[in-house]
Amino acid sequence: MKLEDYFYIEGRYQLKNGVYNVFGSVYLIKKVEKLPCKFGKVSNSFYCWNNNLETLEGCPDFVGNFFDCHDNKLTSLKGCPTYIGNDFICDQNLQSTKEYRQYLIFK
């Protein structure tokens, strides 16, 4: 897998132990149902909106700024970052907002 075939990286990245850490922002540019790799830390924003994602597995654990996964085919927030420094945008996905509300309360 070539990272640049799936993502536009604004900044630089490092691959360590199969996990990509990005010093900048990440934009998913290819339509996929699942991310083809695992991200650890993204210092700025992570954008995977308007896609076909059915899962957030592979998303970064840490996002320093915005995390935008709106308009996908998600049914769960499993795999969602544990830290998001700014807005978490996830509308037009979940059938039920119960899990989303629980996540916001937890945050």
Could you say what each language-model-derived stretch is?
Residues 69, 75-107:
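Leucine-rich solenoid repeat scaffolds
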